């Protein structure tokens, strides 16, 4: 492991904290901010229905965290390392008669996201949204670091694309989804808030491999399987209180200078170690160097402090979680996204689960998902 203990330098003059209300302006579901860059292939007549299941993901680290620190009109080239998780969104899309419009099953728990995904996908295909959509999701906490919002949007969009024969290639679909991402506003029902989206949630279902490196513009540059002997153990603080997106975004905006400072200080080191150590080893089936880089990023480069807005006491909790790394109980140990969930990729799930439970965390066991999204039923 390469130890990184140099204190972070001052970031220079402190920039005025932006007014969150002046950034990330809300928008209506179905708004297309960035059209599909490449025209779709032939759009065949839709099947009568299709069912797919789409994995979720854990976000181990960003490659350039400073790139998320601003309202960049939904284009974020921060890059990330993600682990695909066998906790799924189950999507059922049915064709309706021409002119019948879009309807969502009453059981859809996050209707604005499902509606947005269906509408922007139909816009990309150049078809009318005459569809009925149902979604059931495996249980996961919302706004805890699982990418539940972005993976749900990706799941519905991929299912609609699948219904029409997949005319939009995955390499084009991924940046289209990141460039049009939004999440429920919170204080303004029916609207979405732009949220930084780097592409890992969509990539986890569009590309095979349990671990993926996503670079700029939603470009997957590495996708490899997770060895079968490793599993995921996730710890979520029991004291977690769900907060609305607009409140979380306001808290994150106040920390933007910290993200920029981390990026300016550490992104060259991250890039070098990723390119010359972590990726070559991962291609040979060794995730050790990647795990060392992830640990240093989270626990030594200031990432967890940057994300401390997501949960009271997060930094102190990280100090307690860190023991799993020093005990060599985890191949990868990280906060997921901005948290507050932590996870371990491990060959000793019992030890990791015990530690999370000792720290008053709910424990979730999951398997890495080494495939793509899967069709589970269709009819023509």
Residue positions per predicted region:
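Short beta-strand
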Residues: 332-336, 365
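Active-site nucleophile and cofactor-binding loops and adjacent substrate-binding regions
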Residues: 146-148, 195, 204, 335
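ATP-dependent small-molecule kinase catalytic core of the GHMP/sugar-kinase superfamily
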Residues: 3-48, 61, 67-78, 169, ...
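Intrinsically disordered, low-complexity, positively charged segments
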Residues: 49-85, 90, 97
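Anion-binding (especially nucleotide phosphate/pyrophosphate-binding) glycine-rich loop
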Residues: 48-49, 86-191
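N-terminal pre-core extensions flanking Radical SAM catalytic domains
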Residues: 335-346
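Residue-level signal for inorganic ion chemistry
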Residues: 60, 91, 290, 337
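Short Gly/Pro-enriched turn/cap motifs at secondary-structure boundaries
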Residues: 80-84, 193-195, 333
């Amino acid at each position: 492991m390469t130890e990184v203990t140099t204190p972070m330098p001052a970031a220079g003059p402190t920039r005025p904290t932006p007014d969150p209300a002046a950034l990330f302006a809300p928008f209506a579901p179905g708004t297309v901010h960035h059209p599909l860059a490449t025209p779709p292939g032939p759009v065949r007549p839709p099947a009568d229905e299709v069912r797919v299941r789409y994995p979720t993901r854990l976000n181990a680290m960003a490659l350039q965290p400073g790139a998320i620190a601003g309202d960049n009109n939904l284009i974020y080239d921060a890059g990330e390392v993600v682990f695909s998780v066998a906790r799924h969104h189950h999507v059922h899309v049915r064709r309706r008669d021409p002119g019948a419009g879009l309807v969502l099953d009453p059981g859809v728990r996050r209707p604005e996201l499902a509606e947005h995904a269906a509408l922007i996908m139909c816009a990309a295909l150049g078809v009318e949204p005459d569809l009925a959509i149902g979604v059931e999701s495996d249980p996961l906490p919302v706004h805890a670091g699982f990418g539940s919002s972005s993976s749900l949007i990706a799941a519905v969009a991929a299912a609609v694309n699948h219904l029409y024969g997949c005319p939009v290639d995955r390499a084009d679909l991924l940046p289209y989804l990141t460039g049009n991402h939004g999440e429920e506003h919170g204080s303004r029902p029916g609207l979405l808030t732009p949220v930084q989206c780097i592409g890992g949630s969509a990539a986890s279902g569009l590309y095979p491999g349990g671990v993926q490196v996503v670079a700029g513009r939603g470009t997957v540059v590495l996708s490899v399987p997770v060895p079968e002997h490793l599993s995921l153990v996730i710890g979520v603080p029991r004291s977690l209180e769900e907060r609305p997106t607009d409140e979380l975004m306001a808290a994150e905006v106040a920390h933007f200078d910290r993200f920029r400072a981390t990026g300016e200080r550490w992104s060259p080191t991250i890039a070098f170690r990723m390119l010359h150590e972590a990726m070559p080893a991962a291609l040979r089936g060794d995730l050790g160097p990647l795990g060392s880089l992830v640990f240093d990023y989270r626990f030594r480069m200031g990432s967890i402090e940057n994300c401390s807005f997501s949960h009271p006491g997060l930094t102190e909790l990280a100090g307690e979680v860190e023991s799993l790394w020093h005990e060599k109980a985890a191949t990868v140990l990280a906060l997921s996204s901005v948290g507050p969930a932590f996870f371990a990729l491990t060959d000793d799930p019992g030890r990791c689960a015990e530690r999370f439970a000792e720290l008053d965390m709910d424990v979730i066991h999951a398997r890495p998902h080494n495939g793509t999204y899967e069709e589970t039923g269709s009819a023509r």
